[in-house]
Amino acid sequence: MGKNVKTLIWGFGAMGSGMASILLEKGGYELVSVIDTHPQKAGKDVGELLGRAPLGVKVTMDHLKAFGSHPDVALIATSSFVEEVSPQIEFALENDANVITIAEEMSYPWIDSKEIAERLDALALNRGKTVLGTGINPGFVLDTLVVSLSGVCKEVRHIHAKRVNDLAPFGPTVMRTQGVGTTPEKFEEGIRSGNIVGHIGFRQSIMLIAKALGWTIEDIVEERQPIITNVRRKTNYVDVTPGNVAGCRHTARAYSCGREVIFLEHPQQVCPEAEGVRTGDYVVIDGDPPVNLRIEPEIPGGTGTMAMAVNMIPLVVNAPPGLLTMIDLPVPRSISNGF
């Protein structure tokens, strides 16, 4: 084994702090810097914030100071959107760090932010570094996993993938973006205004699958519908009464050569078991041979995202430079001791 990989974490919320804990549990890594804009975290020891012994690494709001530790890789967990994370990615690249971000739109940024994607790719190539967007979804369940399963097929005609999860552990921000707790009328208003977005990443997952399978996508049609509860559903953050919205049923259909080739579903709601709905991840490939995969319950989104980001570090550090996707890299795997 070579020297430890010096790692910086940008964004020390639930995901960033979870990544830090995973890094500290594995060998082969050295957590050298943490950046966060929350004033109550700034200046505090990372170990103490994690409920551990002091590490001698303090959270800072000073980006330049943080990168003075010369990290090999920066894990960015600050936003879902390309426009918001691209300045952070550029700063990391300019300071000679590889980048792994869990921003959903960065899993395939060319589809909605082509100019930014091309700029990031050019900068990464110029600096000899690698940039990757990943996570549980997009990044795995509705794209990388699907692509891997297609490898046993002589032919693929249609793909149907679905993720059913429980939003109960999530906080107010997620509840608002999914419309949880609103009336059906307010849900429709939120869809029109853009305040209720449903799942972020369908378009990116579709393009990852299409690129891997050599399909040309002509159109993507998305639909968002409210999931109305018939029973009371209560979490630590929201109390949903019968007749109101417990979540968002978001779907996306992709067309090639005039026919549907990909159908993705992601109904997200609080306490689905309250009405007999089982959580799970499902992939059905109409191919030769056909493939039907069921994972129940669903792969936990939080843990899965944190683990995927950390587990991709060795693959990214050893990858060719540029802005890459999950289908450009070897199969993800859990590496117990760094490299």
Curated annotation (Swiss-Prot):
InterPro entries: DAP_DH_C, DapB_N, NAD(P)-bd_dom_sf
Alphabetical keyword list: Allosteric enzyme, NAD, NADP, Oxidoreductase
Known catalytic reactions: (2R,4S)-2,4-diaminopentanoate + NAD(+) + H2O = (2R)-2-amino-4-oxopentanoate + NH4(+) + NADH + H(+)
EC numbers on record: 1.4.1.26
Pfam families with a match to the protein in the record: DAP_DH_C, DapB_N
Record carries keyword Oxidoreductase: yes
Keyword Metal-binding: no
Activation/inhibition comment: Allosterically activated by (2R,4S)-DAP. Negatively regulated by AKP, and by both acetyl-CoA and D-alanine.
Gene Ontology terms, MF aspect: 2,4-diaminopentanoate dehydrogenase activity; 4-hydroxy-tetrahydrodipicolinate reductase
GO biological process: lysine biosynthetic process via diaminopimelate; ornithine metabolic process
Complex formation: Homodimer.
Family under the similarity heading: Belongs to the DapB family.
Role summary: Involved in the ornithine fermentation pathway. Catalyzes the oxidative deamination of (2R,4S)-2,4-diaminopentanoate ((2R,4S)-DAP) to yield 2-amino-4-ketopentanoate (AKP). Although Ord is more efficient with (2R,4S)-DAP, the diastereoisomer (2R,4R)-DAP can also be metabolized. Ord is specific for NAD as hydrogen acceptor.
Official protein name in the record: 2,4-diaminopentanoate dehydrogenase
The organism's taxonomic lineage, starting at the top: Bacteria, environmental samples
Annotated gene: ord
